[in-house]
Amino acid sequence: MQYPEAIGRLIESFTKLPGIGPKTAVRLAFHVLDMEEDDVLTFAKSLVSAKRDIKYCTVCGHITDIDPCAICKDSHRDETVVCVVQDSRDVIAMEKMREYRGKYHVLHGAISPMEGIGPEDINVSSLLTRLQENESIQEVILATNPNIEGEATSMYLSRLLKPTGIRVTRLAHGLPVGGDLEYADEVTLSRAMEGRREL
């Protein structure tokens, strides 16, 4: 169907978002038309403001509107542990847990030879610099995703960091709470067995 040009551009803009297909984009566009003008302006300003004002922390690479970020500036956090994650969304997920009190380092991706992404394309060099400059760091927790790219990234970082003498650990992967053993794949079961702990 042919939409007026302004609606067509709005629909096309919505389809650029992850998980938004053409039908959802049309619904969203028409929802915007039904919104109060003040709400639309607030929404538009929020988009522009987020894009303009949010930057990456120069210490850890997490998204922030101040530099360094609030986590890096927090003197109550454990300076001796750095949790390495792929994405700022991973930091947010870890923070929701409210158990980890160390610092973070965001890679902004994972090694993926199939997609042409190597170690030089992610935030590895600043991690090495950070570890060299901060002698108080005693442990690096590798919390990359449990997929091929995340595993490749963890293995690479593990080999790279071992000679530094800093303890390198990997998050345990295993069975989800409420999940049934019979539905778990072999890799998940194997990791759950390896990551078992004393009770």
UniProtKB/Swiss-Prot annotation:
InterPro entries linked: DNA_Rcmb_RecR, Rcmb_RecR, Rcmb_RecR_Znf, TOPRIM_dom, TOPRIM_RecR
One of the GO BP terms on file: DNA repair
SMART domains xrefs: TOPRIM
Positions of C4-type zinc fingers: 57-72
Keyword Transcription: no
A GO molecular-function annotation: zinc ion binding
Chain ranges of the Toprim domain: 80-176
Family: Belongs to the RecR family.
UniProt protein name: Recombination protein RecR
Keywords: DNA damage, DNA recombination, DNA repair, Metal-binding, Zinc, Zinc-finger
Pfam family for this entry, one: Toprim_4
Task of the protein: May play a role in DNA repair. It seems to be involved in an RecBC-independent recombinational process of DNA repair. It may act with RecF and RecO.
Top-rank lineage group of the source organism: Bacteria
CDD domains per UniProt: TOPRIM_recR
Gene3D superfamilies cross-referenced by the UniProt entry: 3.30.60.80, 3.40.1360.10, 6.10.250.240, RecR Domain 1
